């Protein structure tokens, strides 16, 4: 039996679901943002300006997709909470340019932010928990999230607080079913474009197909740098009790079951890895993999929940 979150058929599409433009506090227009990412090999983006919903149907091409979205926020009991919402052009309940009620939401519990987005057909993704100094227990308590950002490139570039792997492992160890996302959160104030992204395996580059693949975990998250690509993960599966990773040339591949059950592989001097396997213990409940290259760029699979 084979288990995997990655679809068995389809092709890979690269994109990012968290970008700001001149519509809020970014420095590039939506048109210039689309042109930048498309010229650098991306297949899709979501423009998620603060507290305003963007659809941008007029910027869609046959080979480039604009995902509707927004980022809404609140200050609750002294904590700052940001939640990204993304959806399909027809299925979100928000028109292009819709502005959220800041009076109602500015001090809302973060659960209200999630509920606002999901009630209108959006996926909700908790943004940059490390930058927000979010209480991990509060994050774990939220219901209706699709995932959280394991890497936020802008936060990493400006504050060195963009890698939230501790939060993700905290949630995973407690049985959370959230997926992990890479995101740019680009504003243009620093070199904060094209460093956090996701690569989705989907049947085609259409809104429903792409977002459906994301919902079922058919993607991996990456931390790269502008002009460079993180390790590519071609497949991650469990076959007859063995976890198998296949990837582009890498320095390290970690297969992690739990804090006390893991299996790393490290390339010897002058060599590289493109595959790693680990026979899982019979009581393993889930497994994920992390792949890093010789420049320190990283990709994270989604966890496979074992049956």
Give, region by region, the residue ranges found by the protein language model.
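C-terminal functional module detector
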Residues: 1-12, 175, 179, 186-307
């Amino acid at each position: 039996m084979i288990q995997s979150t990655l679809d068995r058929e389809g092709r890979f599409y690269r994109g990012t679901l968290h970008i700001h433009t001149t519509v809020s506090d970014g420095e590039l227009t939506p048109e210039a943002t689309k042109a930048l990412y498309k010229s650098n090999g991306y297949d899709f983006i979501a423009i998620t300006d603060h507290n305003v919903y963007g659809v941008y149907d007029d910027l869609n091409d046959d080979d480039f997709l604009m995902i509707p979205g927004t980022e809404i926020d609140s200050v609750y009991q002294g904590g700052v909470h940001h939640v990204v919402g993304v959806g399909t052009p027809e299925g979100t309940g928000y028109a292009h340019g819709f502005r959220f009620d800041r009076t109602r939401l500015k001090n809302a519990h973060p659960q209200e932010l999630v509920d606002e987005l999901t009630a209108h057909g959006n996926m909700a993704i908790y943004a940059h928990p490390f930058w927000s100094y979010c209480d991990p227990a509060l994050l774990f308590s939220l219901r209706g999230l699709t995932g959280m950002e394991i890497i936020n490139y802008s936060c990493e570039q400006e504050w060195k607080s963009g890698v939230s792997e501790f939060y993700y492992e905290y949630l995973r160890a407690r049985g959370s079913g959230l997926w992990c996302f890479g995101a740019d959160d680009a504003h243009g104030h620093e070199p904060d474009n094209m460093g956090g992204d996701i690569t989705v395996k989907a049947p085609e580059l259409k809104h429903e197909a792409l977002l459906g693949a994301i919902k079922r975990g058919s993607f991996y998250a990456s931390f790269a740098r502008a002009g460079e690509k993180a390790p590519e993960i071609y497949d991650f599966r469990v076959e007859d009790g063995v976890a198998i990773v296949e990837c582009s040339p890498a320095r390290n591949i970690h297969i992690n079951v739990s804090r006390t059950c893991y299996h790393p592989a490290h390339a010897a001097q002058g060599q590289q890895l493109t595959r790693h396997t680990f026979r899982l213990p019979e009581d393993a409940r889930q497994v994920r993999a992390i792949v890093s290259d010789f420049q320190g760029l990283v990709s994270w699979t989604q966890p496979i929940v074992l049956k």
